[in-house]
């Protein structure tokens, strides 16, 4: 039997996304040896346009040295309507890279551990493959998750705590 391909969407921005993806991968390998192959993809670095492709370097400095502007961006884009508008802009801006990701990395299951990647990547996979891969959104924030994290069209949305769910 051919192993199922699992693609993890993450970025090394310092928010624990890689650690979450690696923990899920390790658990799956332990529980289902040989059933899956795994690939971790740093979406910001490999598939987003400038200056977003620099986010792994920019983001830690931004949240530590310009926290007020980060918080403003969080608040301006949080909420159902505001996040939908922001995501529509992101989808258009990132479209080419997300299509390239879907073409270069065919998947049976896509697991997003970064809130900004779920919608644009899911949209690209839906348009580029003969079938739609299963899509799992993993919320990594324990308390105050952004609206982007809760992807309504995902097959599963895994939320770590009741506080994050509420």
Describe each model-derived feature in a short phrase:
Residues 23-103:
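Conserved N-terminal ligand/cofactor-binding loop architecture of enzyme catalytic domains
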Residues 22-24, 54-55, 124-127, 150-153:
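Short, glycine/charged-enriched secondary-structure capping and boundary segments
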Residues 126-166:
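Active-site-proximal region of nucleotide-activated glycan assembly enzymes
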Residues 96-110, 119-136:
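Glycosyltransferases and closely related glycan-assembly transferases
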Residues 17, 47-48, 118-120, 144-147, ...:
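Short, well-ordered alpha-helical microsegments
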Residues 2-47, 105-108, 112-113, 130-131, ...:
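Soluble, non-transmembrane catalytic domains of enzymes that act on hydrophobic metabolites at membranes
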């Amino acid at each position: 039997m051919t192993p199922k391909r699992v693609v993890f969407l993450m970025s090394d921005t310092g928010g624990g996304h890689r650690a979450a993806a690696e923990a899920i991968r390790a658990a799956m390998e332990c529980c289902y040896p040989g059933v899956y192959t795994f690939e971790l993809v740093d979406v910001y670095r490999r598939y987003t346009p400038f200056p977003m492709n620099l986010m792994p370097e920019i983001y830690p400095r931004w949240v530590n040295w310009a926290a007020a502007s980060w918080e403003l961006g969080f608040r301006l884009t949080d909420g159902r309507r505001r996040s939908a508008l922001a995501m529509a802009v992101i989808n258009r801006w990132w479209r080419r890279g997300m299509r390239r990701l879907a073409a270069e990395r065919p998947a049976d299951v896509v697991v997003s551990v970064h809130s900004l990647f779920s919608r644009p990547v899911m949209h690209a996979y839906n348009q580029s493959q003969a079938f739609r891969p299963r899509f799992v959104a993993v919320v990594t924030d324990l308390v105050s998750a952004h609206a982007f994290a809760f992807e309504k069209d995902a097959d599963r949305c895994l939320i770590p705590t009741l506080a994050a769910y509420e």
